[in-house]
Curated annotation (Swiss-Prot):
EC number: 2.3.1.117
The protein's enzyme class: transferase
Keyword set, alphabetical order: Acyltransferase, Amino-acid biosynthesis, Cytoplasm, Diaminopimelate biosynthesis, Lysine biosynthesis, Repeat, Transferase
GO cellular component, one term: cytoplasm
The protein, known as: 2,3,4,5-tetrahydropyridine-2,6-dicarboxylate N-succinyltransferase
HAMAP family to which the protein is assigned, alphabetical: DapD
BP GO annotations: diaminopimelate biosynthetic process; lysine biosynthetic process via diaminopimelate
Pathway: Amino-acid biosynthesis; L-lysine biosynthesis via DAP pathway; LL-2,6-diaminopimelate from (S)-tetrahydrodipicolinate (succinylase route): step 1/3
Matching InterPro entries: DapD_Trfase_Hexpep_rpt_fam (IPR005664), Hexapep (IPR001451), Hexapep_transf_CS (IPR018357), THP_succinylTrfase_dom1 (IPR023180), THP_succinylTrfase_N_sf (IPR037133), Trimer_LpxA-like_sf (IPR011004)
Species this protein is from: Bordetella pertussis (strain Tohama I / ATCC BAA-589 / NCTC 13251)
Positions contributing to substrate binding: R105, D142
Highest taxon listed in the record's lineage: Bacteria
Amino acid sequence: MTLDLQTTIEQAWENRANLSPVDASAEVRDAVEHTIDGLDLGRLRVAEKIDDQWIVHQWIKKAVLLSFRLHDNAVMGQGPLQFYDKVPTKFAGYGEAAFKAGGYRVVPPAVARRGAFIARNVVLMPSYVNIGAYVDEGTMVDTWATVGSCAQIGKNVHLSGGVGIGGVLEPLQANPTIIEDNCFIGARSEVVEGVVVEENSVLAMGVFLSQSTKIYDRATGKVSYGRVPSGSVVVPGSLPSEDGSHSLACAVIVKRVDAQTRAKTSINDLLRA
């Protein structure tokens, strides 16, 4: 079934300029809808870790992009929260039984789009989770945090207030941003452009990471890009230019996570009781 979906999506992608809400075959519509349903239920993922390597399923990302060409804007929502969009909200039509079955908590006015997967024991404070995102078990998405399209958030992650996790749709990116298990992302931090924050890492408040951000390891003096090694404690910093005339912002790995640092983040358990 998945192979058939992939083949149909790949063929439709090559013909995407000719697709519209009134000009698309039933086969293409069904393939896109099945893919979005799979994302919504967590049966499909844009990226998954296989043998310790993140594998990106580009065809699934293409299905997400194609879905925007197959639908017109429509009024959705209820009460004071009315929207005009092409993608319905994930929780449209949910009653108490559906929320209990999902096993997560959604605090108003949190919004998740259909096609985002929310796992059990996730807490969505007033936040936004975009289509194609995957939020794994036990994660807290705090107030005004944003999980971008197709972003992958691991288990027991805390995305603090105002955190931005970049998406892949606008601007178009090749790979999703990934936050692995047991990470703590400090308030107002931004992680974008397919950067990977490996498991058990802690980002202090106000850390900004893109593919062009220098990541300086204080212990080794080495500079890297695009990936925070597992167990890192990262703070905002700056590095001087070669001639010393100016400095540019960077992220600094100040140490590896120890038991004391992890203990400080366990306060999140109190917020979920």
